């Protein structure tokens, strides 16, 4: 609890805590000058073999189309490096309850570390590009379109400040809107007002004074103090919790900003209200009112800032609070919440009848606000609660001691008009007790309502007339208000929406609101879905589709259908009639590209030119098969990737890379495979090494990626963890050896995060791996006493299981050379760097063969080129020494 986390970036080289004696056998060089032993000893950043470095640093082609202009004539794309710059990541920063702050620049660290430095417009009809000017030396984030599509606003971040800029689409030129620096700590984007004349921003307050200090000379003025007050507050192990009153003061200082409007014509700044700890801002269409969500005190030492309380208020243009819309209390947990895992509470008791205003949003097709409100028969008259009532406190959800909840008889959808008094409400629609999402067409003539398992289209001029859109049709949450995302349209994801279902397509309108796309005939909507193969996933791929539906007649027309031998996925329409739209096409041998489909002309044209950066990997040989373990016949799937020039009869050094998961039955495990897509192209991602594992085959290794299911009774699967882990790995190893892919005497094992945990467990249980790699893992489960991963029991409820699963307590049994890596600033719950340093201390004390590399400035996985390249260098050096060139196991003399 009192361990002080790394608070600022202050380490400038990779720290090697220990390298035990290694084999004197020299590893065969993967490239000229490659010396694994020197690589492992180096105390600065190093690089892998040249061909591996090329795979990592070669820029990937961005083919995304996610940010359309309101008329969809252009798409906006931010461009830059695929990985981060160590100089940006190393810039001084602090952690305050999980909020990462670049204190010199008054912004979130994520803004500072943005890799984007350019803005480009793409013509969706031709693929032609047009650059937008960005100031030299700036990174860009938070970009958004103006309502009429003639301008793009963005945050330009420099070394010590961020500013609002606007680019003109016609000329490509950018101008700085104001010299006032932005406070981009909690609010990291900027938006236009609905009339396009101003920007809504949060600024650094004028005259706010110097940052808080501990006291005279910055000297700590007392001990860190904690009192339980005999209150049970079980929590997962959070990173970077607030430590003391000084950090509370810092959090308040760096999150308190001034809401303002920046006039694009005059460049004048209009301040709105007093500075507050603003989390989010949403303006009415006329910018006369603002929904302002603020973080509230008290702060807590027990939970991160994301669990701190908040209040949402309605402000007028002068910053006067008109009314309080919603309040959320500090959420530290409640031990009597039976539904919360391991005592993770949900905010205390709730009233038996909730008649508060919920889902408050700006009316997308009219003035004022809209909200929903439940009606209960127990109210006597059945009338809704008074319109002026504010939102309830607490975090929502049930509590164990809550009174029995009455069943709502109906749910009303109401408008709330200025000046937002108690009598300024009007019922728009009244539905059943299961009334869900409500959305509109852009012209406001049609309302779409999800109610009691169906979606209805309702003419606003004839609210009693409803058209049922059919079985299985869905309307995504969030479609009915609030400022949407990029506007590419909702998708059905991996759900099986094969027959008469589908997800209604939405897009972002000129006012920033999300609307259901309705054709120019006023009655046609688009639905997307995916036919999933279910149990046939290993031979058939998911097949996305797009239908047009005449909701008055019920007639459906298939517009787009993915072929069986490829994977085509709808991206976005270019008009409301869906006569032109973009989609991606790929196959196991065809890299993804975006195509323009013209339905009227029945033509398709490729408009992007994606590049395969690693044909030696994308052309690798992949074998997929099932393995049965002898004890009970339970089966698991295994993928083996072999170099493209591999020939049968050649046994390679092998690497098992895995991530265990828990299941109650074989059938449940099999269902988890249903989302596998056999028609995907095997691209080489630019992301962290742990997700780019196919790079192993570039150096002559066989990569084995098995599922490692842990089976058991619900809530008790981990009681079988070590048994299943050992038996599953035995079965996998036997299978890949018997298939002739690998040499049993040259096998390594590795994993990241929970896979690292599994790896350390594996080498503490079995002796036959020649080398191992474990990164960002937790190796002592007594350090996560109130649950981890899918384990919901506490250490005190399942002590034997926690201890049995902790490889730290079997460190003396480890004989496999183990390379650990960990990020110094790992913010993932339950994988503190302490885990790696303590495990290393144990291995050092026991004289085991181990190495530890601690990466500065990095989080739960490396994000910079420097760390990425360094990791691959150390990985290859370790396995080249211990696995690829491992001496043959001596067979006993008969």
Q: Predicted regions: what is each one?
A:
Residues 16-19, 864:
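Alpha-helical and His/Cys-centered functional microenvironments
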Residues 7, 12, 19, 25-603, ...:
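Beta-propeller folds
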Residues 17, 305, 846-849:
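N-terminal hydrophobic alpha-helix used for membrane targeting or insertion
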Residues 287-288, 297, 348, 358, ...:
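Serine-hydrolase catalytic core recognition
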């Amino acid at each position: 609890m009192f361990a002080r986390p790394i608070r600022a970036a202050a380490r400038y080289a990779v720290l090697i805590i220990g390298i035990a004696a290694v084999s004197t056998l020299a590893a065969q060089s993967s490239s000229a000058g490659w010396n694994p032993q020197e690589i492992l000893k180096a105390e600065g950043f190093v690089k892998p073999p040249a061909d591996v470095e090329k795979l990592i640093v070669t820029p990937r082609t961005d083919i995304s189309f996610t940010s359309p202009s309101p008329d969809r004539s252009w798409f906006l794309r931010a461009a830059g490096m695929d990985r981060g710059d160590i100089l940006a990541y190393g810039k001084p920063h602090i952690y305050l309850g999980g909020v990462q702050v670049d204190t010199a620049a008054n912004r979130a660290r994520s803004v500072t570390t943005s890799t984007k430095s350019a803005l480009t417009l793409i013509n969706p009809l031709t693929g032609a590009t047009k650059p937008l000017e960005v100031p030299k030396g700036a990174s860009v984030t938070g970009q958004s379109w103006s309502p009429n599509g003639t301008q793009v606003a963005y945050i330009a971040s420099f070394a010590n400040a961020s500013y609002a800029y606007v680019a003109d689409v016609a000329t490509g030129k950018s101008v700085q809107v104001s010299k006032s620096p932005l406070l981009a700590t909690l609010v990291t984007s900027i938006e236009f007002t609905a009339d396009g004349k101003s920007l809504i921003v949060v600024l650094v307050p004028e005259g706010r004074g110097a940052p808080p200090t501990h006291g005279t000379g910055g000297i700590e003025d007392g001990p860190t103090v904690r009192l339980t007050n005999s209150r049970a507050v079980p929590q997962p192990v959070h990173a970077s919790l607030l430590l003391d009153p000084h950090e509370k003061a810092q959090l308040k200082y760096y999150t308190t900003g001034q809401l303002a409007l920046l006039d694009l014509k005059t460049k004048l700044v209009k301040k709105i209200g007093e500075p507050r700890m603003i989390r989010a801002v949403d303006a009415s269409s006329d910018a006369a009112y603002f929904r302002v969500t603020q973080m509230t005190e008290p702060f807590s030492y027990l939970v991160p800032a994301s669990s701190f309380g908040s209040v949402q208020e309605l402000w007028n243009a002068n910053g006067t609070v008109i009314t309080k819309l919603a309040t959320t209390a500090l959420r530290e947990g409640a031990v009597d919440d039976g539904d919360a895992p391991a005592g993770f509470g949900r905010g205390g008791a709730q009233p038996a009848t909730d008649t508060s205003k919920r889902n408050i949003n700006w009316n997308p097709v009219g003035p004022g606000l809209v909200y929903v409100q439940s009606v209960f028969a127990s109210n006597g008259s059945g009338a809704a609660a008074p319109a002026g009532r504010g939102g309830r406190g607490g975090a929502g959800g049930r509590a164990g001691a809550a009174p029995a909840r009455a069943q709502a008889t109906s749910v009303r959808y109401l408008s709330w008009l200025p000046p937002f008094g108690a009598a300024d409400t009007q019922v728009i629609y009244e539905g059943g007790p299961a009334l869900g999402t409500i959305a509109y067409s852009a012209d406001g003539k049609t309302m779409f309502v999800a109610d009691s398992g169906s979606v209805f289209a309702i003419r606003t001029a004839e609210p009693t007339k409803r058209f049922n859109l059919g079985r299985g049709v869905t309307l995504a949450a969030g479609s009915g208000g609030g400022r949407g995302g990029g506007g590419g349209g909702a998708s059905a994801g991996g759900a099986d929406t094969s027959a008469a279902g589908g997800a209604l397509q939405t897009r972002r309108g000129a006012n920033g609101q999300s609307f259901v796309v309705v054709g120019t005939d006023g009655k046609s909507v688009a639905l997307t879905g995916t036919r999933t193969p279910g149990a046939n996933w290993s031979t058939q791929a998911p097949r996305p589709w797009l239908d047009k539906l005449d909701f008055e007649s019920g007639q459906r027309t298939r517009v787009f259908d993915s072929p069986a031998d490829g994977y085509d996925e709808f991206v976005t329409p270019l008009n409301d009639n869906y006569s032109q739209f973009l989609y991606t096409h790929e196959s196991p041998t065809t890299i993804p590209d975006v195509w323009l489909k013209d339905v009227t002309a029945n033509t398709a044209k490729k408009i992007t030119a994606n590049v395969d950066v690693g044909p030696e990997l994308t052309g690798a040989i992949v074998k997929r098969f099932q393995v049965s373990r002898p004890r009970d016949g339970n089966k698991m799937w295994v993928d083996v990737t072999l170099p493209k020039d591999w020939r049968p009869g050649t046994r390679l050094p092998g690497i098992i890379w895995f991530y265990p998961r828990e299941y109650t039955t074989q059938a449940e495990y099999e269902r988890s495979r249903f989302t596998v897509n056999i028609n995907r192209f095997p691209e080489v991602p630019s992301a962290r090494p742990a997700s780019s594992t196919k790079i192993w085959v570039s150096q002559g290794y066989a990569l084995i990626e098995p599922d490692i299911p842990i089976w058991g009774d619900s809530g008790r699967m981990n009681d079988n963890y070590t048994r299943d882990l050992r038996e599953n790995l035995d079965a996998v190893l036997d299978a890949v050896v018997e298939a002739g892919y690998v040499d049993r005497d040259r096998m390594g094992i590795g994993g990241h995060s929970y896979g690292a945990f599994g790896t350390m467990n594996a080498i503490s249980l079995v002796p036959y791996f020649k080398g191992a790699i474990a990164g960002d893992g937790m190796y002592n489960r007594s350090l996560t006493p109130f649950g981890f991963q899918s384990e919901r029991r506490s250490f005190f409820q399942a002590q034997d299981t926690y201890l049995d699963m902790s490889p730290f307590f079997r460190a003396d049994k480890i004989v496999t050379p183990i390379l650990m890596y960990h990020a110094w600033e790992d913010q993932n719950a339950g994988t503190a760097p302490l885990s790696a340093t303590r495990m290393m201390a144990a291995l050092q004390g026991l004289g085991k063969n181990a190495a530890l590399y601690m990466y500065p400035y990095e989080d739960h996985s490396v994000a910079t080129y420097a760390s990425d390249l360094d990791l691959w260098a150390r990985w290859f050096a370790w396995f080249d020494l211990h696995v690829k060139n491992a001496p043959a196991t001596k067979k006993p003399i008969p």
